[in-house]
From Swiss-Prot:
Annotated domain remarks: The SOCS box domain mediates the interaction with the Elongin BC complex, an adapter module in different E3 ubiquitin ligase complexes.
Keyword Transferase in annotation: no
Subunit structure: Interacts with RBCK1. Interacts with phosphorylated IRS4. Interacts with PIM3. Interacts with KIT (phosphorylated).
Coiled coil spans: none
Gene that encodes it: SOCS6
Taxonomic lineage: Eukaryota, Metazoa, Chordata, Craniata, Vertebrata
Biased composition (Basic residues): 80-89
Region (Disordered): 80-105
Domain SOCS box: 486-535
SMART domains: SH2, SOCS, SOCS_box
Protein name: Suppressor of cytokine signaling 6
Domain annotation SH2: ranges: 384-491
């Protein structure tokens, strides 16, 4: 029997213990090492390669190999305990330590792994080059209408700014028509905050915010506002204009037989505004105008006796603006007349002569006012009626047309209602249409051959013109020529191809009273265009 000494037993016992510990360390830790190996690409920027692939068992395995065989079990336990304490101390140190000192033990690895994995979303977003804010935007429910309105305000709209300009004009829409007051207030607050951050847009928002939508400045309607016929300087500085085609430049003795005669329209002397440069005033001639042709033309302003007499129905024109209140009517009659005028959608201010007629017939009762209104509505449907155009515009429309062509327009003389412009002997002539006692005529005696309807008067004149001149025209000036009048070719405004903006204005004026145009949600330029002369 072989003898085994106590020393040999101790050595064999120590060897077995060290083998068991080594196996325990090898089997326990590779799971953590493999986990770190899988995330090598994830933590590559945070840790070095040597640290990312470091052996977690480094210190313990080396310690196990270099450990002397004679080391006791208590020494091994003490060494492991000291290694654990040292690893815990190193885990609490800041991240600025070097990679050599950053070694892991089995107890510190889960803690460090948890802290590192918390940084994974930040690393992944930076690798994909997506820039997200760490704090998400606060979400609140918004409907599509509110979003669209806000985008209209931010992108397309031009809102009142501190330095207004004509480019800021456009189609204005009230937020009150689109949203409730609470929504408006919420949008106003959001817009104010956004404007303060941008610095480009300065908004001054109230409860009701006018906003420009749809149109840009280059889309605005470009037009020229014509001067009104009543726009004169002071009374003493008023000048006169004589057109080259005016019949007053021809001197002849009118025939005394064969046909009737009616005076021409003298508004070219009283009311026209263009000053011809070739006309000079000679102080040696008492109130006479000398033209380049040498014809002496007497001015109606030379003396008060030369002014043509007023119509017996119409009072003289006042300087102040006439109020449309039907003061001549009282009670129910005034209400009936006003309601009928509004129902027929006719404004007396649309024509200078019409306004005078309305004032003059107030005392005749509501039936006369209603009858005249209906007659003027009927007149507006005729193609040969051109509305409030000047005599110069009428001459332009009658240029290069044959004799017998004519049109009817509003008179430029405030004392009369309508004028007739016609062609005769290659010239464009003008005459007034008289209105007295509810009858219309070309003569100073409307009771003889007057018509209660303007349309009937023109149609009767066209029928009479088929057999020749139905009357003759002469000027009030002595020695002026007489021209035969034939109305055979009415010049219709419907034959012209009008612009789209004109047609839009025409439709709006058909369905909107002129006194309500200022209340439309439109820019001021469009309102001015709608209130211009509509023919």
């Amino acid at each position: 029997m072989k003898k085994i000494s106590l020393k040999t037993l101790r050595k064999s016992f120590n060897l077995n213990k060290s083998k068991e510990e080594t196996d325990f360390m090898v089997v326990q830790q590779p799971s953590l090492a493999s986990d770190f190996g899988k995330d090598d690409s994830l933590f590559g920027s945070c840790y070095g390669k040597d640290m990312a692939s470091c052996d977690i068992n480094g210190e313990d395995e080396k310690g196990g190999k270099n450990r002397s065989k004679s080391e006791s079990l208590m020494g091994t336990l003490k060494r492991r305990l000291s290694a654990k304490q040292k690893s815990k101390g190193k885990a609490g140190t800041p991240s600025g330590s070097s990679a050599d000192e950053d070694t892991f033990s089995s107890s510190s690895a889960p803690i460090v792994f948890k802290d590192v994995r918390a940084q994974r979303p930040i690393r992944s977003t930076s690798l994909r080059s997506h820039h997200y804010s760490p704090a998400p935007w606060p979400l609140r429910p918004t409907n599509s209408e509110e979003t669209c309105i806000k985008m209209e305000v931010r992108v397309k709209a031009l809102v009142h700014s501190s330095s207004p300009s004509p480019a800021l004009n456009g189609v204005r829409k009230d937020f009150h028509d689109l949203q409730s007051e609470t929504t408006c207030q919420e949008q106003a607050n959001s817009l104010k905050s956004s404007a303060s951050h941008n610095g480009d847009l300065h908004l001054h928002l109230d409860e009701h915010v006018p906003v420009v939508i749809g149109l840009m400045p280059q889309d605005y309607i470009q037009y020229t506002v014509p001067l009104d016929e009543g726009m004169y300087p002071l009374e003493g500085s008023r000048s006169y204009c004589l057109d080259s085609s005016s019949p007053m430049e021809v001197s002849a003795v009118p025939p005394q037989v064969g046909g009737r005669a009616f005076p021409e329209d003298e508004s070219q002397v009283d009311q026209d505004l263009v000053v011809a440069p070739e006309i000079f005033v000679d102080q040696s001639v008492n109130g006479l105008l000398i033209g380049t042709t040498g014809v002496m033309l007497q001015s109606p302003r030379a003396g008060h006796d030369d002014v043509p007499p007023l119509s017996p129905l119409l009072p003289p024109m006042q300087n102040n603006q006439i109020q449309r209140n039907f003061s001549g009517l009282t009670g129910t009659e005034a209400h009936v007349a006003e309601s009928m005028r509004c129902h027929l959608n006719f404004d007396p201010n649309s024509a200078p002569g019409v306004a005078r007629v309305y004032d003059s017939v107030q005392s005749s009762g509501p039936m006369v006012v209603t009858s005249l209104t209906e007659e003027l509505k009927k007149l507006a449907k005729q193609g040969w009626y051109w509305g409030p155009i000047t005599r110069w515009e009428a001459e332009g429309k009658l240029a290069n047309v044959p004799d017998g062509s004519f049109l009817v327009r509003d008179s430029s003389d405030d004392r009369y209602l309508l004028s007739l412009s016609f062609r005769s002997h290659g010239k464009t002539l003008h005459t007034r249409i008289e209105h007295s006692n509810g009858r219309f005529s070309f003569y100073e005696q409307p009771d003889v051959e007057g018509h209660t309807s303007i349309v009937d008067l023109i149609e009767h004149s066209i029928r009479d013109s088929e057999n020749g001149a139905f009357c003759y025209s002469r000027s009030r000036l002595p020695g002026s020529a007489t021209y035969p009048v034939r109305l055979t070719n009415p010049v219709s405004r419907f034959m012209q191809v009008r612009s789209l903006q004109y047609l839009c204005r025409f439709v709006i004026r058909q369905y909107t009273r002129i006194d309500l145009i200022q209340k439309l949600p439109l820019p001021n330029k469009m309102k001015d265009y709608l209130q211009e002369k509509h023919y």
